[in-house]
Amino acid sequence: MLKIGVGPSSSHTLGPWRAAEAFLKELREKRLLSKTTKVHVDLYGSLSLTGKGHATDLAVMLGLSGADPEYVPIESLDVIITAITNNQKLCLGNEQIINFNPKENIVFNRNFLPFHANGLTFTAEGEDFNYTSTFYSVGGGFIVKEGVQAATKEETRRNFPFPIDKAEELINYCHQEGKKISEIVYENEKSLRTEEQIHNELMRIWHTMLECTYIGCHTEGVLPGGLHVRRRAYDIHKNLIGVVTYDSPQNWLNSIKKTNIKFREILKWVSCFSLAVNEVNASLGRVVTAPTNGSAGVIPAVLLYYVTIENQQATEEHIQQFLLVAGEIGSLFKKGATISAAMGGCQAEIGVSSAMAAGALCELLGGSPEQVLIAAEIAMEHHLGLTCDPIGGLVQIPCIERNAMGAIKAINAAELAIETDPKNAKVPLDKVINTMWQTAKDMNSKYKETSEGGLAVAVNMADC
């Protein structure tokens, strides 16, 4: 659920990038890569309508080139793209040089494929073959290949000591085992990897979150894309931190802990953290999908709030606990609804990320398993129906500010949940997840990451 990748979008950048990698793998397995002389890519639906603003075409080129979004140096991205565009050649899988004109070989088709709003088809041609494969980017960087039967729910559940599809099941396990939500999730993770691997991966995710927040707080200027959006995290951070010297993200955190913090400063710090992450995301920087790139700022902002303000003695164990709970709550939404704005609007992104952060924070504040899920429910309840209408198809307006609002709501939801007797709660998390999905299905496609309605129409690119 929490994955390291490159911005600006998990569904429109990371997903297509991963699809291109999967296509390369197929070509290698069929021993066709070295015989390929041409590759054609068709983008459909939302990938086509907002693909330019979301850098879908660039992601496809980078994926076909063999670059890994987790590890490729960010500074090399422009070099790779410029070389392909200027030379009209692409080194397929970093092995086979082919002719490739992005304007001709990547086609934006406005029509939608039936399975999902984010479809893309790759076609490889050689002297004696023509191989085609279609993928769907279903949100959060996850992809599905057309025609491949996914593992059944029963097969998936069989792999875990505590199989979970619904919040009710999660609570039942907590009661049966006398464990916190994070402990139940940890036991499930242990069926997939060692304790050392779990710890190392969670810390890698945390350090990526910290690094991108640090970069965002120390980078000024204007975001790319034509909206001329000025970065704000830099100025907010400068006003908050004062005249202090530090030489690393960790020393920076220590400096923040020493600042004078009252209610207004809390609001500003949380907003600053979230803006910083999403400004990095909007400039094709490296972030953690949480659960998406467009909502990547909420969870780091709330976690940083906890370690710098709420509990300045927080340890790696607290961070691990937070991420485990957040990931499980996100998984519940993915299984019961969607984490794709192209399917459910922004409630599927900021709404889900706010619910994830609220539940995770609630456990760290001492909330019971019931209160953790109440926190997640409160956060989502107040995002239901939120539209996805990015101006110019860019993950900037209103996306960046929405992360700040989602983070503040998450903190408030956690505090409300702590003060709630679970016996008096009226809306179970499973009900709000189902309601979110019904709302998503009822929502007009204009408000599902197509830039055909809402702010995307009301505010002209020329006005910016």
Give each language-model segment a name:
Residues M1-G5, V270-N278, F322-G330, A376-A379, ...:
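Short alpha-helical scaffolding segments that buttress acidic/His motifs in well-ordered protein cores
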Residues L2-A20, S283-V302, C346-S354:
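Conserved phosphate/anionic-ligand binding catalytic regions in large, soluble enzymes, centered on
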Residues S11-R28, P300-Q312, A358-G366:
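Alpha-helical support elements that line or immediately flank enzyme active sites
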Residues Q313, V325, S331-A404, L416-V427:
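Hydrophobic alpha-helical bundle architecture
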